[in-house]
Amino acid sequence: MNEALALIVEDDEDLNEVFRQALAAAGFSTESAYDGRTALEFLEKISPSIVILDLHLPFVSGETILKKIHSTPSLENIRVVITTADAAAAEFLRDQADLVLVKPISYIQLRDLTKRLNPVLQTDKFKTPPRTE
């Protein structure tokens, strides 16, 4: 069985691994990027169903990656979960993502994230449906 693909873009190796384990347990296959440049390279090669995106990254910012996702037709339907320790940035970007998690991220937030992602796994051939608001 093919799995939906999640791209985890988080420079904190421990948090990246926590996301990887949680998403794998929820049924996703995962790829990890630890900086913005690598994330952009992945997005040129793969089409994930979801991107877990830290805002503060080495080389290329999460905001730049978010703009790239929204401005590229082949990427615009990817679900995006923003992670940041900056509550003001989180509020500012709330309407540009499917979900915003403010760090530190609790177990409950992580559990709720995987529950919210379950519909992604149920879509035909794991195509991410268009965002509805």
Regions found by a protein language model. Give the residues of each.
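Conserved acidic carboxylate
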Residues: 10, 84
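Charged docking surfaces used in two-component/phosphorelay signaling
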Residues: 17-25
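Acidic, metal-coordinating helix/loop segments flanking the phosphotransfer/catalytic sites
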Residues: 32-50
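C-terminal output helix
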Residues: 38, 105-118, 122, 126-127
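Conserved phosphotransfer cores of two-component systems
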Residues: 44-46, 70-77, 95
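Active-site residues of response regulator receiver
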Residues: 54
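The feature encodes the CheY-like receiver
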Residues: 58
